[in-house]
Regions:
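Conserved donor-binding/catalytic core segment of Leloir-type glycosyltransferases
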Residues: 6-8, 165-200, 216
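Glycosyltransferase donor-sugar binding loop
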Residues: 41, 182, 213-228, 246-247
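Donor nucleotide-sugar binding/catalytic pocket of nucleotide-sugar-dependent glycosyltransferases
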Residues: 117, 121-161
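Nucleotide-activated donor-binding/catalytic signature segment of Leloir-type glycosyltransferases, i.e.
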Residues: 227-248
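Acidic donor-binding loop of glycosyltransferase active sites
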Residues: 258-272, 286
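Short hydrophobic beta-strand element within catalytic cores of glycosyltransferases
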Residues: 283, 287-290
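Conserved acidic donor-binding segment of nucleotide-sugar-dependent glycosyltransferases
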Residues: 302-313, 321-326
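A charged, aromatic-enriched C-terminal amphipathic alpha-helix characteristic of glycosyltransferases
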Residues: 313, 326-357
């Protein structure tokens, strides 16, 4: 039996980030055996002519395309989508983020906006990361063509159940908690707010309080953020409260996730969708501190999975909520079971497989109908 051919048009690692990790998980899974996968890497915009040529000569049954959320990237995407439509190719796009609608409504020209509406309307389907993000494509494509595929924590970053139980048990009598920020150092991601939380902790301890939190940071710096980070830590003498790990992966990342108790991502990043780092933290039985931004509320509920900060909360109020938390072990184990049952790698792959199968079956049925009509 011939396998259906799926062409994946996306950014592949390196570097490793949320999007590239998601498609890498697909390529290195059973889907690579079930389908004949073809890869077209779009991370080098200078190679756009080469990308177009590869698409033109591809005989894939389905094109799976992860779209951009920048003005320039959108122009490239429109060119690719126009080519696929001209060639009457079956196309499914996957939005790994939550900014696309704001991009085309606010950031691009009227002509580019109109082109986007026309391009989306002509697609066979779109995928978003969570239920609340379906609104991004409302009015652009019929609702039944909007699919939800939630992100996952890869198996290598999920604790075995027995280890998760033991970790939660140790939280009962633990006096000092390790708080982890694991993301890129972008201002809108909220790392500066985490530094201010570390400063509040230092001031409280200096006023005869017992140390309750140590803050661990890991990720890649962008622009001048490394200078800001180092200057802040040095100016406020936070070396006893802050540890910088740099970029981590593999065993180092596993170790950091295992050793930390609370995960913090106070993000307001415009392009945010459903952060994989939050899912990985849940898979390591961690208490979550985050915001009601993008698709995060579909995953984290305030009081149930941790603290979900609204836009009007002050840093002092957030710190007070951290101090007031009790029974962390129950919340952390609940987060672990949620990740295993809902955000596992197997669930993610099954969801992708299901959407692909739906669209490919439609194509097969259409071909059969056409052949029968010719008889």
């Amino acid at each position: 039996m011939n396998r259906s051919k799926v062409c994946i048009i996306s950014q592949f690692p390196p570097p490793m980030h949320g999007l590239s990790k998601a498609v890498d998980t697909i390529v290195n899974s059973y889907l690579n055996n079930k389908y004949d996968l073809e890869i077209i890497d779009t991370k080098n915009n200078k190679a756009i002519l080469k990308t177009i040529y590869k698409i033109m000569i591809s005989d894939a049954d389905l094109f799976y395309f992860t779209i951009s959320q920048s003005v320039g990237g959108n122009l490239r995407d429109l060119l690719i989508l126009k080519l696929l439509r001209f060639q009457k190719k079956k196309c499914l796009i996957h939005l790994h983020g939550g900014y696309y609608r704001k991009l085309i409504e606010n950031d691009v020209s009227k002509i580019q906006k109109k082109m986007n509406y026309r391009a989306i309307k002509g697609l066979d389907g779109v995928i978003v990361l969570s239920a609340s993000l379906k609104s991004i494509f409302e009015g652009m494509i019929t609702p039944e063509r909007i699919f939800t595929v939630e992100n996952c924590a890869d198996d290598e970053f999920i604790l075995p159940e027995e280890d998760a139980r033991k970790k939660c048990e140790t939280l009962i009598n633990k006096s000092e908690h390790r708080v982890l920020y694991l993301s890129n150092f972008i201002k809108e991601k909220g790392y500066r707010e985490v530094l201010n939380l570390a400063l509040l902790e230092k001031k409280r301890v200096e006023n005869s309080g017992e140390k309750k939190f140590h803050f661990h940071f890991a990720g890649k710096f962008f622009d001048q953020e490394e200078e800001y980070f180092n200057t802040f830590v040095s100016r406020h003498n936070l070396t006893d409260y802050v540890t910088l790990h740099g970029v981590v992966g593999g065993e180092k990342k596993q170790h950091l996730l295992r050793e930390c108790d609370m995960f913090i991502l106070p993000t307001r990043y415009p392009n945010e969708g459903q952060p994989i780092s939050i899912l990985e933290a849940m898979g390591n039985a961690m208490f979550i501190i985050t915001t009601d931004h993008a698709g995060i509320p579909d995953v984290v509920q305030d009081g149930k999975n941790g603290v979900v900060a609204t836009a009007d909360i002050t840093i002092e109020q957030l710190y007070a909520r951290m101090l007031s938390q009790k029974d962390l072990q129950d919340v952390c184990y609940n987060n672990y079971t949620l990740c295993v049952s809902r955000f596992s790698q197997s669930n993610y792959l099954a969801s992708v497989d299901k959407v692909w199968s739906i669209l490919l079956r439609e194509d097969s049925s259409r071909r059969t109908d056409n052949e029968n009509s010719k008889k």
